[in-house]
């Protein structure tokens, strides 16, 4: 997998809900910045083909994970996740055929889960595969939209969702495996026509569906793996889960 796969990690966000002057991805879990855990997993599946998109406190982020064998891309304006990935596209290795996109605030994600996503994507020969999980309480997450044939036709962010769409329990984890070609074709067609006025990466799923591309869903991730850290309370919860995981392993 390492010869053809690259990973893009989104780590440029402001993290306002952390209520802290420190960049969100620099908050520590077990003495390490949460971003370091995501980088570890990315390197395991892609070797040196890992790109970290930085923005807020970019230099501090680079210093905090300075030992990592990754390259950095600077997102000068916070225009959304789609724009962040667009900034990273020119830095992809020439031999890269598949791209995995991760968020820098999911420190519990494991390499086996990512490898399973990639294998599912490659085996099916899809243009894009998103990792999805069904939750009892999906509040706060984007919802995965399915058509009458149970095919993925889009993702709707909660802020833009109707009451009916908010009842959907299948959520987007923000983790994708896509072909480089599809990513290059779809991203220029993303527009900021949403409640936040941002370029959402999630829109590539709708764009792919509408243009007849092969879009699919991969299941199987443990719930705790996809937990994002957005608040101090989330940070405490994730740290407790990581301590519990370490205790089981030992």
Residue ranges and their predicted role:
Residues 17, 107-108:
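A short, conserved beta-strand element in the Rossmann-like catalytic core
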